[in-house]
Amino acid sequence: MEMEDKPVAEAVAPAPKRRPWGKIAGFSVLGVLLLILVFTGIIYVTLPNVEEVRERNPKETAIMRHREAQFKEKGKKLRRIHYWAPLSRISPLLIQAVLISEDDKFFQHEGFDWEEMREAMEKNLDRKQVVRGGSTITQQLAKNLYLRPARTPWRKLQEALIARKLEKTLSKRRILELYLNVIEWGDGLYGAEAAARTCFGKAAAELTPAEAIRLVSVIINPHRYSAVSNASKRMRNKRLLLAQRMYQRELFDEPTFQSLCEDFSQ
């Protein structure tokens, strides 16, 4: 009796087990994003009430308290010199010099100048040191009013959120007025009026082009550089460049520009 041939089932290879790495990576990214959102939310709900400075002039800022605490730790007392001046009583030349030097697109942006930040990062990476800041006037105001100096991602996030809140709440004119009245111009020296009186013995409204440029040039590091001294080569170059940019915008005439060049070259 012949056996009937039956087809033999081919052995099927077991399906390869899927490794969970893709899912793990996806969950990890999601977890990080959720963590960032949670921290951002926490920071946002604890932001200062910037409505308070819409009309009220602050008598004290975070940077003032921080500087005084630094001196106290060394057993010293820092004398605070601070006089308030409305924008109408600050030299237009000083205002223009600040805008040109610190934030040339102040009236165009909404708190951040992305192009300036990119250029600053590229220049700093090229020089392998911080030689150019990318912060707008609004960001600088946020730091001075509410934050202690620090270089952390969360600190930058706080600064960014406060800057955005300032831009939404205050007019550009008010932001500029606040900035010019709380910015540091030396140890214990805050605001344009205090700087003008201390450095040049006059009101901020009476500053000459040379004095305005000298004051603005030291904003980068008022604890290292002096507005009344021309000894630093870096300051001389910075002042010459700022004078040139102001002259190009017809903020003063050619004889004044030539006089400034002579002054800042010595």
Task: Map each language-model feature to its residues.
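Juxtamembrane regions of bacterial inner-membrane/periplasmic proteins
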Residues: 2-266
